[in-house]
Swiss-Prot record:
Identification of the protein by name: Nuclear factor related to kappa-B-binding protein
Molecular function per GO: DNA binding
Subcellular location: Nucleus
Family: Belongs to the NFRKB family.
């Protein structure tokens, strides 16, 4: 046995079947108690098995000792044993039959069927063991029963011998009949039927009654019946469960049918509740469908197909039948003289021989069985549905045969529509296409009557013809009228969409490429992608394949961007090499332009841009998705043929010139589309990087002036992206004017917005135009504005002294009073920003102001035409007309001792932010004649370093506080930039208790008209309050910026000049806070007196002057104020909102920015600080480019995206929220009682506010930019 084990485990026995790398699939087999691993192919493939187990292996592979060991298992012969064993071995390998088959063939079948599997062997042994136990048990029972019978018989014989003696003959007793009720009933039935049959035979009656038929089912088979002819069993070898089914069908006779019916009646009589007998919900169609469904894929379907072919042959044979003569010959019977001699009397007398003549065989008429469907139908569609209903799902050829059989019947001509078409067989397929709803003429409401099954290639009826006969007739007449047009159109479409003929025919079959072939292809591929914008021709394997240019590449200049990462492609490839382009090239290289997906994968593997460690499964998956994408392109290059299961390259008939012509057309279309999508850019740019208006200089710099009238305002609400150029009215100009402004561009579009999907920008409907203008060399004369132009502002300049005039139109007040003018030296060129603002009208005064603010540029501005560079410096001069007696004046006074003028400074560089913000009166309707509709207006001119905050960083807590979360990365980014934010404390607005009445009166006073500079005037906002309550507070800036805080009254503290210049930006609108101002605020600028109207935010930038922001107690105006003085070393940008309140209206919210940049960092946590306290108002802005929300009037439009948009309604806000453009934006109605103290209007009406809320995140998103 040890030698057998070594032989079975010897590698020589397996031969070439075992792969050297061990990747072959092995199967374990149990041979004689030894577990052996054999290749699966060896066991499954008979040819391979007999190649291994062969005579050659016996002679050349096995050793002599192994052969001698195996010969021991052969039978031993007494004579000539060696030769006999050799003959047996030869017969064994030849496949001779050893009476019960060849042992090698039997072994191969056992190997193939898995009988040597260890598990099978185990269970077979257990089964044999169980059968042996059962056998032993049955043997025990048999012998036990036999023993009892023997003992009983022995006793009986002994008793008989003892009684009768030896001479008595033994009489065997017959076995007792079983008297069970079933046996008695059976005998009675048989006896009854026997008597009944004998009576009927005597009477000659052959009919049977129903009772007799039921009784006849008990009749046993008569022994006189001839045994039926045995049907040969032709078993088709297969692995299915139908191995034992007969191949030939048994024909049922009438006798068999009667027996079947009798058994069915008996079954119904005895088992009425059997499931097979419940036929309440069954119909004939269901039965036919169930019967036909069983034939699919079975052997019966194969034989039905063979029977159908035989019928077709029989039809052809019948057509070829001719008259045939039957040749008969006279048969000569052999003489039997012996018998004639023996019995002469028995033989009849001889009769003359009759010669049989030839008889003509007349062809019998073909008697066709009646069709299962009605031959007369309402229309052709009904006929087709009847055929499908009776036959079940049918293929197109079978339907055409059925229609042909129907057309050959005489009854078919009785249909009124029969003569419409000469051959209805040709119209079967078009009619089915129409009934399935796939026809192009069919309407969208068309209900299909049939459907086509792609898998089985069969048509199935889905609607019964009897249920919709009228509808079918109407469709039939419509189809007859339009079928010719449909066919012509479909034929043209088929011609256009037909598979193109390949340019070069080839018999090449795709196979793995050799190293040389792969090298040749990669070289061609390299040349192909050197010029991706041109077509290329691959020349491989004796044929050419033309591919078009790479889609989206229209010029030779390649992109410097890095290619997108792909798991299958190399990272160092060109950016335009994608998996789609490579699959397109592989499909183009298919031989004859068609092939399978596996062939495309094989061609793709030759590409040099594939990663080296890519597997075939990954390539197959990616190619599958790429082919689907190519299949659904606008101009698809591939399509899938379902019938042949091949991918077809549709562009194989195109030439390189045709490809390039189409590509050039696509390039032109893409260029035109891109030009339409681009926005109009400003004509010129500042060198500083801020997109502003450039100037058109001619000759020497001379003065220029601009007037902004009402016509410059947009008449209807619109987006800032569509600015309206302001008109230039005729105003007095200096004689030396030689430079004019040529273009005015809205400031809201000067900054290109960066794309951000998490940004919602909403701006006001009334967008006043902001323009940056340059003023040439100034003259010594000043011009004024006619008082009637209440909505205009002019710049009147003298030599080095520009002026900004604020014209206030009042009702009932003469406007002839002179204006206070302050002049300052100015450089030859100046830039201005014009800001129209609106004040709250009182009962006696309605004011409209337009402020023109000059902008100083620290760097040189290059003129586009002259090439000269000039340096500008300017000042602000605001004049106020005396309104009426008894009104308080408001002014901003600049000190003559200041070291520099007060200017709005424009700083160059990529990290500079310029911001101009306007704030108006909320809840106050502007006067149509004298005021500008500037309610809640936000304008922003920003640089490129605006921090983009994600929505998750802006949250609102349960108390209504808006929380701004800034990550350490954001703080580090801002700390490096030149822009530094400042924290504005709330103490400025809590100096005194707020009036309980909620009223605020604005007192306007003006200085007497005189050419000399008037005394400094103050802006007083005096709420009604108790005189006893006095307090003061100061405007605090963070010490980290080098700005000292004035803690004592009357003391001025300045910052050190050694500090570097820092731009402090107080961003408007991070939150809204109700005004708690309880003292008169005065803004004093150390310069000549200028007057600033109320409801205006002035953004002065102090270059070298001091700004004092004191708060004055309303009851003690003469008290020395406390303030903050910004030193000359720090350039600040300050926004100071001054608002008024009108009874019955909601006052404007004072914008209180609050930043956390000056907060000390503790660890890596997130710095969180409240923005505001109280409810959110209608003006939320200043979060970089993130959110600007204003009040929402009805009937305005929404433009989603990252551009500033108009007002939006509550419904549009809801739509925007559903689209994911905003986190949570809602309009909230706040009752008057819930408003903070001091901000509630006199009326108890609810106020609608826009609230932006976001869900706070546990881990904020860190975005550096």
């Amino acid at each position: 046995m040890e030698s057998l084990d070594s032989m079975l485990t010897d590698p020589l026995e397996l031969g070439p079947c075992v792969e050297s790398n061990g990747t072959g699939i092995m199967e374990e087999c149990m041979l004689g108690g030894t577990r052996v691993s054999l290749p699966e192919d060896l066991l499954e493939d008979p040819d391979l098995f007999f190649e291994v187990v062969s005579r050659d292996t016996w002679k050349n592979v096995l050793s002599d000792s192994q052969r001698e060991h195996l010969k021991q298992f052969l039978p031993v012969f007494p004579d000539d044993n060696a030769n006999q064993q050799e003959k047996i071995i030869q017969s064994l390998f030849r496949g001779d039959n050893f009476r019960f088959g060849n042992p090698l063939h039997i072994a191969q079948k056992l190997f193939r069927d898995g009988h040597f599997n260890p598990e099978v062997v185990k269970y077979r042994q257990l089964c044999l063991k169980s059968q042996y136990k059962r056998y032993l048990t049955s043997q025990q029972q048999y012998f036990h029963k036999l023993l009892k019978q023997i003992l009983a018989s022995r006793k009986e014989l002994l008793d008989l011998a003892r009684k009768n003696g030896p001479d008595q003959v033994l009489k065997k007793k017959p076995s007792s009949l079983r008297n069970t009720p079933e046996e008695r009933e059976t005998r009675a039935q048989c006896r009854y039927l026997k008597i009944l049959r004998e009576v009927k035979d005597e009477c000659g009656d052959g009919t049977l009654s129903s009772e007799e038929e039921d009784l006849s089912s008990w009749l046993p088979e008569s022994p006189t019946h001839c045994p039926s002819v045995a049907v040969p069993l032709r078993v088709i070898p297969t692995l299915s469960t139908q191995d034992m089914k007969t191949a030939d069908k048994q024909e049922f006779t009438n006798h068999d049918l009667k027996l079947l019916l009798r058994r069915h009646r008996e079954k119904r009589k005895r088992q009425s509740d059997h499931p097979d007998l419940i036929t309440d919900n069954l119909s004939m169609n269901d039965i036919m469908t169930r019967v036909n469904a069983g034939r699919k894929g079975s052997l019966a379907a194969l034989f039905d197909l063979a029977t159908m072919k035989k019928r077709v042959k029989e039809k052809d044979d019948k057509k070829k039948k001719k008259l045939k003569t039957i040749k008969t010959e006279v048969e000569d019977y052999p003489d039997m003289p012996d018998e004639a001699d023996i019995m002469p009397a028995v033989l009849p007398p001889e009769t003359p021989q009759v010669t049989l003549t030839a008889v003509k065989e007349e062809p019998l008429e073909d008697v066709k069985p009646p069709l299962p469907f009605n031959e007369i139908s309402a229309c052709f569609f009904c006929l087709l549905l009847d055929i499908l209903t009776m036959e079940g799902p049918c293929s197109l050829p079978l339907l055409e045969d059925k229609v042909s059989d129907w057309q050959s019947l005489p009854a078919s001509t009785l249909n009124s529509w029969f003569s419409v078409a000469p051959n209805w067989c040709d119209l079967v397929h078009p009619a089915l296409i129409y009934l399935s709803g796939e026809c192009k003429v069919a309407s969208s409401s068309f209900t299909p009557f049939v459907e086509f099954r792609e898998k089985t290639q069969q048509w199935k009826c889905v609607v019964s013809s009897s249920d919709s006969e009228k509808e079918l007739v109407a469709h039939f007449h419509l189809w007859l009228e339009t079928k010719d047009q449909i066919y012509s159109k479909e034929n043209e479409d088929c011609i256009d969409a037909s598979t193109p003929i390949p340019r070069v025919r080839t018999d090449y079959i795709v196979r793995p490429s050799s190293g040389e072939e792969k090298h040749v292809f990669q070289e061609q591929e390299r040349h192909r992608y050197i010029q991706p914008h041109k077509a290329f021709t691959f020349r491989m394997h004796g044929f050419e394949s033309v591919v078009g240019p790479v889609k989206g590449v229209f010029d030779k200049e390649t992109s410097l961007n890095k290619a997108r990462e792909h798991s299958l492609l190399r990272s160092d490839r060109p950016a335009y090499v994608t998996i789609l382009s490579l699959v397109r090239d592989a499909a183009a290289r298919l031989p004859n332009g068609e092939g399978t997906r596996a062939e495309i994968c094989e061609l793709l593997k030759d590409s040099q841009f594939l990663a080296p460690d890519v597997t075939s499964a990954q390539v197959n998956t990616v190619v599958s998705g790429a082919l689907d994408r190519l299949h659904y392109e606008k101009d698809p290059c591939v399509k899938y043929d379902i019938g042949r299961k091949l991918w077809i390259y549709l562009h194989r008939d195109r030439s390189e010139e045709e490809f390039e012509r189409i590509h050039q057309a696509q390039a032109a279309a893409a260029k035109a589309k891109k030009a339409l999508q681009q926005k109009p850019k400003p004509p010129t740019k500042m060198k500083s990087g801020s997109k502003e208006c450039s100037l058109k200089l001619c000759g020497t710099p001379e003065p220029a002036q601009l007037s902004l009238t009402e016509s410059s305002m947009p008449p209807t609400p619109g987006t800032p992206g569509t600015p309206t150029p302001p008109a230039l009215p005729s105003t007095p100009m200096s004689p030396s004017t030689s430079a004019t402004v040529n273009k005015i561009v809205a400031s809201t579009i000067t900054e290109t917005q960066k794309s951000s999907q998490s940004v919602l920008l909403v701006s006001s409907p009334a967008m006043p135009q902001l323009s940056t203008l340059l003023s040439p060399a100034v003259t010594s004369q000043s011009t004024s504005v006619t008082p009637t132009s209440g909505r205009a502002a002019t710049i009147s300049s003298s030599t080095g002294v520009p002026q900004v005039r604020i014209v206030t139109a009042t009702t009932g007040v003469p406007t002839t009073q002179s204006a206070a003018v302050v002049t300052q030296p100015l450089s030859p060129v100046i830039s201005h920003i014009r800001l129209p603002v609106t004040t709250t009208p009182t009962k006696a005064l309605a004011q409209t102001q337009v402020v023109t603010v000059p902008v100083k540029n620290q760097t040189t501005i290059g003129a586009s035409r002259l090439g000269a560079s000039v340096t500008t410096q300017g000042s602000v001069t605001v004049n106020t007309l005396n309104s009426s007696a008894g009104l308080a004046s408001k002014s901003v006074v600049s000190s003559p001792g200041a070291s520099g003028p007060a200017i709005l400074q424009s700083i160059t560089g990529q990290s500079i932010i310029k911001q101009v913000a306007l704030s108006g009166q909320l809840g106050v309707k502007s006067q149509p004649s004298s005021s500008l509709p500037l309610s809640s207006t936000n304008f922003r001119i920003q640089g490129k370093d605006v921090l983009r905050l994600p929505p998750s960083s802006i949250t609102t807590d349960a108390k209504g506080q808006t929380i701004l979360r800034i990550t350490p990365d954001m703080m580090a980014t801002l700390a490096k930039s030149q822009v530094t934010a400042v924290k504005l404390s709330q103490e400025l607005f809590s100096a005194a208790p707020v009036s309980t009445t909620g009223k605020g009166l604005l007192h306007v006073t003006s200085s007497p008209s005189s050419p000399s500079p008037p005394a400094p005037s103050t802006i007083k906002l005096t709420p009604e309050m108790k005189p006893a309550e006095t307090s003061s507070s100061s405007f605090r800036l963070m010490p980290a910026l080098g700005i000292s805080v004035a803690e004592q009254k009357g003391k001025v503290v300045t910052a050190g000049e050694s500090k570097p210049a820092t731009t402090i930006r107080i961003v408007q609108g991070l939150g809204v806070m109700p005004p708690k101002v309880s003292a008169t605020q005065s803004i004093t600028v150390s310069a000549k007196p200028v007057t600033v109207p109320s409801s205006t935010i002035v953004n002065p930038v102090h270059s070298a002057s001091n700004v004092s922001l004191p708060t004055v107690n309303s009851t003690a105006v003469k008290t020395a104020p406390t303030g903050i003085v910004v030193g000359t070393g720090a350039a600040t940008v300050r926004q100071i909102p001054v608002t008024t309140t009108q009874q019955g209206k909601l006052p404007a919210r004072i914008t209180v920015p609050l930043s956390v940049l000056s907060q000390p960092m503790k660890g890596k946590g997130v710095v969180t600080a409240p923005i505001i306290k109280g409810n959110l108002g209608a003006n939320i802005s200043g979060l970089g480019r993130n959110i600007i929300l204003t009040t929402v009037p009805a009937g305005t439009k929404l433009i989603a995206g990252n551009k500033p948009v108009s007002f939006l309604t509550a419904q549009q806000l809801q739509q925007l929220q559903q689209q994911g453009q905003a986190t949570q934006v809602r309009i909230q109605t706040v009752p008057a009682s819930h408003l903070p103290q001091g901000t509630s209007p006199a009326s108890s009406k609810a106020v609608s506010t826009v609230v932006v809320t976001t869900t706070p995140t546990t881990k904020p998103t860190q975005e550096p930019q």
